[in-house]
């Protein structure tokens, strides 16, 4: 066995969305980092749909960006259609979504990786972990090379024991065209970690030259074109294109229903549970039998390819059935399938065996991020990767680990849900999962996280300077509005009354006027002739002013809960020894091993009375230790 000539502080296994963010985060913090990938050509590859963002997901992307991550900037460089979803609703649920050119997105990620100081890339599959006395010491590659490191971050995606299904045929694979990680999967199953199987799928890809777009509904992007990154601009965007909408029909549903016996999912061949919120077309037909049709979004895969992604017809049915399904859909009667759809089963590990840092509880220095933790989606993977990479670097630096709270970031919601509740199906982020979504908007992710990112070493000088200018501009504009008064009967007062249809009864400052629902910031500054032209600053001023009462109420609630939320539970606490706790609650607490009282309170079945007993126990334990020290 040969040793690699260099030792690293952090090794990241896997070059997908979790792995790239993990490696970049660690390296940005000044830690010597190795990114180990089975194929350098697939770094940052979009394995499924060619899109970034969406409801709940864009919040994660913006948080990654606020902490210096690459996903949003790569989206701005590769995005070929941008839309703001829920644009007519409140700011808490608005979400930016971008179609991405696969080639351009992947190229942007690779360029970022190759130009990141402290980061080395090496092409080799990982077959084994070096573990000594419950501490990870490094990895062993497929050619028997040992590489030593203080911490290892596993971001293996769907590759662990990956099994691809098309009809009744199945074969080993990490995704179509890539080998699975069999040796590593077997090694991980030897560790004292709970393991399960999940499933995901992808639709057949269609040749756009064989599609009749004239009978479909065009879906253009938004104008003006949104940007994804806080540092992004429209000039970075490549040429923009449209998506198209068509629908399944009674004939489509009949084809699927009559072939369910040939579906590996319905014949019992597939054991893994698939994503609830991204079901296969056969699952939709079975679960929603009363629906006459389902939308199919025809999404371009890029500017230099004819391939289309028919979002909404993910399937693992045999190829001949896939062809019938596709050709039964309006506009695709003569469609040519370039790549068949398939389902893939893979190993995942119960995230309740992780700490908030995403370090495993049983092996020191071993971190998990992405689909290995039971999540689905590029954005969820990227967020976990950034957090795991950050904490691996903090460990190397001898610093305390970090994870944002539920009231600080969607990343915090994601991790808390996973390590507290676990998951039996692929976990997807939604805004509805966050209790404090009015303060966790996508538009203020930088105001929530960039200062912390700077403290951790994740945010570079350029981003920090831009952020400081923005933050100061918001404060100055709020002060200007607060100190600018308008009186009834004056030229400005009459202009405001005429424009908004609201007569002024007495003197108002502009900040007071902006709280009114009928008055918007853009119109206000056009009348007064003064104001901020930076759209990000203007947006923050308007949202903070109009929703101030609701935001203050949420902040008060957070402050009340924070004391118990942050109270830490000792790692060696013996729940069986706490009198008054039921056997059921003792068992649940013993299995999850919550890190704080707040986390304990969110375990299903753990009652407020049980939390009170824990608080009493902690006070007694603290008093007992003080007596021991004074004796």
From Swiss-Prot:
InterPro entries: FAD/NAD-bd_sf (IPR036188), GIDA_C_N (IPR049312), MnmG (IPR004416), MnmG-rel (IPR002218), MnmG-rel_CS (IPR020595), MnmG_C (IPR026904), MnmG_C_subdom (IPR047001), MnmG_C_subdom_sf (IPR044920)
Any one of the GO CC terms: cytosol
Coarse class of the protein's main subcellular location: cytoplasm
GO molecular function terms noted in the UniProt entry: flavin adenine dinucleotide binding
Residues holding FAD: 14-19
Domain of life: Bacteria
SMART domains assigned to the protein according to its UniProt record, in alphabetical order: GIDA_assoc_3
Signal peptide: none
Residues that coordinate or bind NAD(+): 274-288
Intracellular or extracellular location(s): Cytoplasm
Residues passing through the membrane, by range: none
Keyword DNA-binding appears in the UniProt entry: no
Keywords associated with the record: Cytoplasm, FAD, Flavoprotein, NAD, tRNA processing
Names of the cofactor(s): FAD
Quaternary context: Homodimer. Heterotetramer of two MnmE and two MnmG subunits.
Task of the protein: NAD-binding protein involved in the addition of a carboxymethylaminomethyl (cmnm) group at the wobble position (U34) of certain tRNAs, forming tRNA-cmnm(5)s(2)U34.
Entry's family note: Belongs to the MnmG family.
PANTHER family noted in UniProt: GLUCOSE INHIBITED DIVISION PROTEIN A, PROTEIN MTO1 HOMOLOG, MITOCHONDRIAL
HAMAP family from the UniProt entry: MnmG_GidA
UniProt-recorded name of the protein: tRNA uridine 5-carboxymethylaminomethyl modification enzyme MnmG
Origin species: Pseudomonas syringae pv. syringae (strain B728a)
